[in-house]
């Protein structure tokens, strides 16, 4: 330092002067030079003192700069939401202890372009030379930035810019989603309504679908907004939209549940969502236009009076089958094995209002049974396999206009033969687990009644023109011309496929020629034939399950039935031989038969 330097110079000068003095014996000029040197040194010292460079001041000057760099500050930077936090932090953005403390995983947004170099938290820390603490789940979305003042200010600007950019992108994304047809939120338009659709707990996930695909599809198809119930709330879907769209959405939900569950909804008091204050729409009759039993997926028929207060799905329960249409002992189509009067009274609620044709069902425990409901304009046919058919109805052929010659005009009786009276015909169908077929029974009327025509087209004609009488389609054997062979029996043999029938409803396999009975039949024979039909159906079902052999020849397959008793235990050849006898009668019930018909299973 200058002070020590000048001290050394003074010591060296004094030593030099002493040396010069010691050698001054030879000359006397040494003292003058020493004084000049001292003056020069003193002048230099004065100059240094004027500049202020002493030892203490120099030390403080050099120590001030490091002390200024060590001054840090901390600032809190809030963002709008935790989604902004996730976007700014990025995937695995937190490092070490800080990333673990946040407690939630961050997924990147693929559509978000980088707003700045270093938008993620690690790059932002490196760029701004600051420490940024990310918020913990459950806390306020606030970043804590620590560092120098200018670095903290830069980090703050970066975080706020990233948050604003993410807000703009999210707003534009929601706008595009709304324009593309998705439902962004509950609408507030006038005329819209909100209904609640209650479903069983176990089918909520079925309605929502995988990742919400099913409920989204229903929303888009019906143009409604549907709020899905949470796990801890009641299983009620809130549907908002125009009234007709809301009804469509409810029907879509119901149809989806019925289609996926087979329509089997166990109705208990704890889980009775039909009568729980919410209109779900699983009503069998759909208001005032119910179409009778088995009409959940068929078109409603206004001619049938609905029966309120029933739980429709209880009639489709079955212990061994999960498909709609499997009739158990509790069925609308008939009673149990005994066919009690209670079942008949239940059926009377759904029978067509026509005395000419009615159908009853003989249910055998858990056997599948197909019930048919014929009306003037529609025939509702359940699905053969018991599965849900959305449109199982068909339009039969129209009735022939008056004056048109009938197919079997050659068998018309004379007008003096008596007026035609309605005949109550019953169709009982039985089924086994291996094969399902139908046995048809046509018992006659009273002793004084003349059998009417059972052809579907003529029935329609009679209902449209009640004042006209319908002639017979086929006479009994003792009245037919040419007693050698019955005309209709020959027709069955020559036309097995039924292609020459007059009406398309029969060509579809729903029926064959349905002739009347001879006028000589008595009420006793008709009652015995109808009473034996139940046992014969059961026995025939067991026989078909075992061997399916003819009960006469035990060789050919059972494909024919006798009319009117309906026993389907014979092959076509044996049935024809029975009809060709002089006094044809059924070998089982000993009832007089008129013809044999082929059965199409």
UniProtKB/Swiss-Prot annotation:
Localization (cell): Cytoplasm; Nucleus; Cytoplasm, P-body; Cytoplasmic granule
Modified residues (Phosphoserine): 4, 320, 494
Every KH domain range: 98-159, 192-253
Free-text description of this protein's post-translational modifications in UniProt: Phosphorylation at Ser-494 creates a docking site for 14-3-3, which stabilizes the protein and modulates its ability to bind RNA.
Stretches with biased composition (Low complexity): 320-331, 362-371, 420-442, 519-540
One annotated Gene Ontology cellular component of this protein: nucleus
GO molecular function: GTPase activating protein binding; RNA binding; zinc ion binding
Compositional bias annotation for Gly residues: 13-33
Biased composition (Pro residues): 395-404
Alphabetical list of PANTHER family matching this protein: RING FINGER AND KH DOMAIN CONTAINING PROTEIN 1, RNA-BINDING PROTEIN MEX3B
Function field: RNA-binding protein. May be involved in post-transcriptional regulatory mechanisms.
Name listed for the protein in its UniProt record: RNA-binding protein MEX3B
Species of origin: Mus musculus
């Amino acid at each position: 330092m200058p002070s020590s330097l000048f001290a050394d110079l003074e010591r060296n000068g004094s030593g030099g002067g002493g040396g010069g003095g010691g050698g001054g014996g030879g000359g006397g000029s040494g003292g003058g030079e020493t004084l000049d040197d001292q003056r020069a040194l003193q002048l230099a010292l004065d100059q240094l003192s004027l500049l202020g460079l002493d030892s203490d001041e120099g030390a403080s000057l050099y120590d001030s700069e490091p002390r200024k760099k060590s001054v840090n500050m901390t600032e809190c930077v809030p963002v709008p939401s935790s989604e902004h936090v996730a976007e700014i932090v990025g995937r695995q953005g937190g490092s070490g202890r800080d990333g673990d403390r946040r407690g939630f995983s961050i997924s990147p947004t693929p559509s978000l372009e980088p707003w700045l170099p270093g938008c993620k938290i690690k790059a932002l820390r490196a760029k701004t030379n600051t420490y940024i603490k990310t918020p913990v789940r459950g806390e306020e979305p606030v970043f804590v930035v620590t560092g120098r003042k200018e670095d903290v200010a830069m980090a703050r600007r970066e975080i706020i810019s990233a948050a604003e950019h993410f807000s703009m992108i999210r707003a534009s994304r929601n706008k595009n989603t709304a324009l593309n047809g998705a439902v962004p939120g509950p609408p507030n338009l006038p005329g819209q309504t909100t209904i609640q659709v209650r479903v069983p707990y176990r089918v909520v996930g079925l309605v929502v679908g995988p990742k919400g695909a099913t409920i989204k599809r229903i929303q888009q198809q019906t143009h409604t907004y549907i709020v899905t119930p949470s796990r801890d709330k009641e299983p009620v879907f809130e549907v908002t939209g125009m009234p007709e769209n809301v009804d469509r959405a409810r029907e879509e939900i119901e149809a989806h549940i019925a289609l996926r569950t087979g329509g089997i909804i166990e109705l208990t008091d704890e889980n009775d969502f039909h009568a729980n204050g919410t209109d779900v729409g699983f009503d069998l009759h759909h208001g005032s236009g119910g179409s009778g039993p088995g009409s959940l997926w068929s078109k409603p028929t206004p001619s049938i009076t609905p029966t309120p207060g029933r739980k429709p799905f209880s009639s489709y329960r079955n212990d061994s089958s999960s498909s709609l249409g499997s009739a158990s002992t509790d069925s609308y189509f008939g009673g149990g094995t005994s066919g009690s009067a209670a079942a008949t009274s239940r059926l009377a609620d759904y029978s067509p209002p026509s005395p000419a044709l009615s159908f009853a069902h003989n249910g055998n425990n858990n056997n599948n049974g197909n019930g048919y409901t014929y009306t003037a304009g529609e025939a509702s046919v359940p699905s053969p396999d018991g599965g849900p058919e959305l449109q199982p109805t068909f339009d039969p052929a129209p009735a022939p206009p008056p004056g048109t010659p009938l197919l079997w005009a050659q068998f018309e009786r004379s007008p003096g033969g008596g007026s035609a009276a309605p005949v109550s015909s019953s169709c009982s169908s039985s089924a086994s687990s291996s094969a399902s077929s139908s046995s048809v029974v046509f018992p006659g009327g009273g002793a004084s009644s003349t059998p009417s025509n059972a052809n579907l087209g003529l029935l329609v004609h009679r209902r449209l023109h009640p004042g006209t009488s319908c002639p017979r389609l086929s006479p009994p054997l003792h009245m037919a011309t040419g007693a050698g062979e019955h005309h209709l029996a020959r027709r069955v043999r020559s036309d097995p496929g039924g292609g020459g029938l007059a009406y398309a409803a029969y060509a579809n396999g729903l029926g064959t020629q349905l002739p009347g009975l001879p006028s000589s039949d008595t009420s006793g024979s008709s009652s015995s034939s109808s009473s034996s039909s139940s046992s014969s159906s059961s026995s025939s079902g067991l026989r078909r399950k075992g061997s399916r052999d003819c009960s006469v020849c035990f060789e050919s397959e059972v494909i024919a039935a006798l009319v009117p008793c309906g026993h389907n235990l014979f092959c076509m050849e044996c049935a024809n031989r029975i009809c060709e006898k002089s006094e044809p009668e059924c070998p089982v019930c000993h009832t007089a038969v008129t013809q044999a018909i082929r059965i199409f299973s």
